[in-house]
Amino acid sequence: MLCSIYKSSKKENTYLYINNKDDFSDVPDSLMGTFGAPQFVMVLKLEGRKLALADVEKVKESLATVGYYLQVPPPVTNLLHQYKAAKASQTS
């Protein structure tokens, strides 16, 4: 299975996977508005691949059923909150 990958012009580290290059017909208009102007990254063969931040099976399933897959960055870990929680548990 081949897919085309685009990065968002508005959201950092946000990528959109679609079945056919430059065919955004399956992507909702509201998502395209939030995503901004898509910037082409590459065409990728998904079989036998491992993706850094996405489960390749979920990507393939979403492409087959919905027509696109949106990859968003993982939530930012607040190290200050973790440190404060660790300190609080040490003093209790």
From Swiss-Prot:
Gene3D superfamilies (UniProt xref): YcgL domain
Domain YcgL: 1-84
This protein's name: YcgL domain-containing protein PBPRA1080
InterPro entries registered for this protein in UniProt: YcgL-like_sf, YcgL_dom
HAMAP family with a match to the protein in the record: UPF0745 (MF_01866)
Organism from which the protein derives: Photobacterium profundum (strain SS9)
Any one Pfam family match given in the protein's UniProt record, by short name: YcgL
